[in-house]
């Protein structure tokens, strides 16, 4: 018995697809070799019978049968076909007898009569198309929408300088007469101009040796250059001067120059074709032309009779001659040059004296130049990264232009009838629009450049091209509105919470996991989370059963499950011991970075919500307005150790992207700290007024009355004097104090006083020293009071500080959190507070 192994994928890559690769995805053939992948009809199904129309968007011949092993004629695969050539295919309708599941992954193909640009590479910022061409966004959109056109030659050429052409060094080579007909392929320079082969000059050189003779003058040709090549055109004789050296009169037309109207280009050519004379100065930019290497192996060949091009075809012709590695090298060289210039400019700026008006003007000029060069360096950096991506991914820039449009399988864009109404996917409407508009594209008439009817036919043809480009944009990215209802594009169906990825492919259910709403848990520690009891029992049920059996409480799994179902108290105690050493993983979708999933030690809480510390919310990008989080339980000891070492929340203090602190107090925390520590007292301007605002101890009835030591211990101080923090907490819980009430508290350690700014130079400002009738010495400072026994120098020193209950509570939270503060007052304390 053989077992079938599932395919194993090491990695998956997303990159540009070549036109040839798109054809390979969709190519299928009849046994006689006829292709069956092209969708030529815009029809979908018959709305009466709901049967797919032939050659349409739901064609059974292209995408497979609707019913398993049944062709469009209704014949099943049990009836054998006598003709072995059509074994597996119906000889009448041509439908393959196979499973209907193939309709979920078989692709179709729409062959576009004119290439169109992929809208995602145009709309994205920065646009890869714009970076490759070096055009502005406005200009790129104008060419794509067929509002402007370019002059593109039938054969791209690049030019050498006169220095390279007329070099006399022995290593230099010159083009021989016999080599003129041979293909000499080089790469297109980043800023080289494109010329027609009949416009380009032809030079015939003989091999030269070192000699003292100089070249004479170069005379122009007496023939006019021609823009369009015709087969019946005869080659006119050419004049040869100066020992076989010849040079044609030539004005270059850049390949990236655009014209909005045909009439403007005709006017330009009218002056370009004007006869030139030998005494006019020649343009030193050109010498002789060479062929340019093209990356068109995987691009379908198209007949090009016009040098005027617009839309995707113009961009494809330009991009097909781009050499990514050469461009990247040139940009690196230019960036180094500009960096050196920037250093010189910055040195000049530093040497200027800004006290003088002339230097200020010069500084502004240099600053504007520096900003422009910085922007230029940024642009070149993006271009280098783009060309490097093309080179690493083994792709070509010309593949951003679509020659063939793949059609999604019918299973992903269904059409059905519900209650007598036909319901179809929005994608079908876009495909129908593309097919209809693509049929309108007709080949251009072979008109002369100065033909009077060229302008009108050109505008009509450009309008049809623009319609096809807009239809493809609606399918891929923008969508449209039909009868007041928005139609979703392919991008809309993929992105967002309701898209294909997040709604259907992601969010799978996993064992030992749960999901619930998160609420704030301010009493939790940073590494803790609150886990509902009911959820914890279900998640940790195997661990509870194991502990119950190990401790001898039960002996079978069934008995343990009964004990857990009854929610016995022993279950909660066992679960609490397990949770002390067993972390859980909390995850909030979407997990965009590694901090989106962290480990916590759970604590059992009542309710059905997960408690989360507020400081860990920024890492999850979570808030408490209904967000949900998933809980995952690491099962093995190895995974638990890995979770505590790598994912524990107390170790994720710094953001991995920037290194900045991740757990920062939020605005409500800062506001809470301020509210907790502020006082009701207003800022006093004079120090003398501070004495009257503080009651001294001899004014208090608490110190004037003689009481025994037990009464002093068990009674609450009157007139806002306290000897312990617990007494402050008790008075606050009863309601005798507020957070901002000024009080005096006994304190033996150091204290930070709130001294006004004008007294900050002094350590403490002494307000008054008093001596009572009983011999007790009292010293009053701004925020502290000191009392000494009658023995003066050898007596015990007692210090009281002036503070508020809010500051005491904050001190307890920071420094004495482990000490248990009494939450309920005793009966004697309640009586003494009620008397006040």
Curated annotation (Swiss-Prot):
Keywords: Chloroplast, DNA-directed RNA polymerase, Magnesium, Metal-binding, Nucleotidyltransferase, Plastid, Transcription, Transferase, Zinc. Its EC number is 2.7.7.6. Pfam families: RNA_pol_Rpb1_1 (PF04997), RNA_pol_Rpb1_2 (PF00623). Binds 1 Mg(2+) ion per subunit. Zn(2+) binds at residues 71, 73, 90, 93. GO terms for molecular function: DNA binding; DNA-directed RNA polymerase activity; metal ion binding. GO terms for cellular component: chloroplast; DNA-directed RNA polymerase complex; mitochondrion. Mg(2+) binds at residues 623, 625, 627. Its cofactor is Mg(2+); Zn(2+). It is found in: Plastid, Chloroplast. The keyword Metal-binding applies. PANTHER family: DNA-DIRECTED RNA POLYMERASE (PTHR19376), DNA-DIRECTED RNA POLYMERASE SUBUNIT BETA (PTHR19376:SF54). In plastids the minimal PEP RNA polymerase catalytic core is composed of four subunits: alpha, beta, beta', and beta''. When a (nuclear-encoded) sigma factor is associated with the core the holoenzyme is formed, which can initiate transcription. DNA-dependent RNA polymerase catalyzes the transcription of DNA into RNA using the four ribonucleoside triphosphates as substrates. This is DNA-directed RNA polymerase subunit beta'. It comes from Chlorella vulgaris (Green alga).
């Amino acid at each position: 018995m053989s077992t079938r192994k599932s395919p194993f994928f090491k990695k998956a890559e997303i990159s540009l697809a070549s036109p040839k690769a798109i054809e390979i995805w969709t190519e299928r053939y009849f046994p006689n070799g006829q292709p069956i992948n092209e969708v030529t009809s815009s029809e979908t199904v018959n709305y009466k019978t709901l049967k797919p129309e032939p050659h349409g968007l739901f064609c059974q011949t292209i995408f497979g049968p609707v019913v398993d092993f049944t062709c469009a004629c209704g014949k099943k695969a049990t009836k054998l076909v006598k003709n072995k050539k059509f074994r597996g295919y119906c000889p009448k309708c041509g439908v393959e007898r196979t499973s209907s599941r193939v309709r979920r992954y078989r692709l179709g193909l729409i062959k576009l009569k004119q290439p169109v640009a992929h809208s995602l590479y145009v709309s994205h910022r920065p646009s890869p198309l714009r970076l490759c061409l070096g055009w502005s966004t406005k200009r790129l959109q104008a060419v794509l929408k067929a509002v402007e056109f370019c002059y593109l030659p039938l054969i791209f050429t690049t030019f050498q300088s006169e220095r390279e052409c007329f070099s006399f060094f022995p290593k230099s080579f010159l083009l021989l007469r016999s080599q003129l007909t041979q293909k000499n392929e080089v790469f297109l320079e980043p800023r080289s101009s494109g010329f027609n082969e009949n416009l380009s000059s032809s030079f015939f050189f003989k091999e030269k040796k070192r000699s003292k003779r100089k070249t004479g003058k170069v005379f122009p040709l007496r023939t006019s250059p021609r823009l369009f090549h015709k087969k019946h055109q005869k080659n006119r004789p050419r004049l040869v001067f100066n020992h076989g050296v010849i040079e044609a009169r030539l004005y270059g037309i850049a390949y990236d120059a655009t014209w909005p109207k045909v009439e403007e280009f005709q006017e330009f050519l009218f002056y370009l074709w004007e006869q030139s004379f030998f005494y006019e100065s020649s343009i030193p930019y050109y010498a002789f032309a060479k062929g340019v290497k093209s990356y068109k192996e995987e691009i379908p060949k198209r007949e090009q009779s016009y040098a005027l091009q617009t839309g995707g075809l113009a961009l494809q012709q330009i991009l097909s001659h781009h050499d990514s590695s050469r461009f990247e090298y040139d940009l690196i060289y230019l960036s180094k040059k500009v960096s050196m210039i920037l250093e010189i400019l910055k040195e000049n700026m530093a040497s200027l004296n800004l006290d003088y008006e002339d230097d200020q003007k010069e500084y502004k000029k240099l600053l504007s130049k520096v900003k422009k060069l910085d922007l230029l360096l940024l642009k070149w950096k993006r271009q280098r990264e783009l060309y490097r991506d093309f080179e690493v991914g083994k792709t070509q820039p010309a593949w951003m232009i679509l020659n063939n449009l793949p059609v999604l399988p019918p299973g992903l864009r269904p059409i059905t009838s519900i209650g007598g109404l036909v319901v179809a996917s929005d994608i079908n409407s876009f495909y129908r629009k593309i097919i209809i508009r693509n049929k309108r594209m007709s080949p251009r008439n072979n008109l002369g450049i100065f033909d009077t009817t060229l302008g009108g036919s050109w505008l009509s043809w450009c309008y049809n091209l623009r319609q096809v480009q807009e239809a493809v944009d609606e399918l891929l990215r923008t969508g449209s509105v039909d009868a007041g209802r928005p139609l979703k594009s392919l991008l809309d169906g993929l992105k967002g919470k309701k898209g294909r990825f997040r709604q259907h492919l992601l969010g799978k259910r996993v064992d030992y996991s749960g999901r619930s709403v998160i609420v704030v848990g301010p009493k939790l520690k940073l590494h803790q989370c609150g886990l509902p009891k009911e959820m914890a029992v279900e998640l940790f049920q195997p661990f509870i059963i194991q502990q119950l059996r190990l401790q001898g409480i039960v002996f079978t799994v069934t008995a343990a499950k009964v004990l857990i179902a009854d929610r016995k108290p022993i279950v909660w105690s066992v679960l609490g011991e397990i949770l002390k050493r067993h972390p859980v993983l909390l995850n909030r979708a979407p997990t965009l970075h590694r901090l989106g999933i962290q480990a916590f030690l759970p604590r059992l809480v009542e309710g059905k919500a997960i408690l989360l510390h507020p400081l860990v919310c920024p890492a999850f990008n979570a808030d408490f307005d209904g967000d949900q989080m998933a809980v995952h339980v690491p099962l093995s000891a190895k995974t638990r150790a890995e979770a505590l070492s790598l994912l524990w929340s107390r170790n994720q203090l710094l953001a991995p992207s920037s290194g900045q602190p991740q757990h920062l107090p939020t605005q409500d925390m800062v506001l809470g700290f301020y509210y907790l520590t502020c006082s009701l007292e207003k800022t006093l301007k004079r120090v003398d007024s501070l004495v009257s605002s503080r009651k001294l101890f001899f004014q208090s009835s608490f110190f004037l009355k003689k009481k025994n030591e037990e009464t002093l211990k068990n009674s609450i101080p009157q007139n806002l004097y306290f000897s312990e923090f617990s007494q402050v907490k008790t008075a606050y819980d009863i309601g005798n104090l507020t957070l901002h009430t000024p009080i005096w508290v006994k304190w033996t350690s150091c204290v930070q006083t709130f001294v006004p700014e004008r007294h900050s130079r002094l350590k403490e400002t002494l307000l008054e020293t008093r001596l009572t009738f009983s011999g007790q010495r009292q010293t009053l400072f701004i925020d502290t009071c000191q009392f000494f026994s009658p023995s003066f120098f050898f007596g015990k020193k007692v210090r009281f500080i002036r503070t508020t209950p809010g500051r005491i509570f904050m001190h307890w939270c920071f420094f004495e959190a482990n000490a248990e503060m009494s939450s309920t007052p005793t009966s004697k304390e309640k009586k003494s507070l009620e008397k006040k």
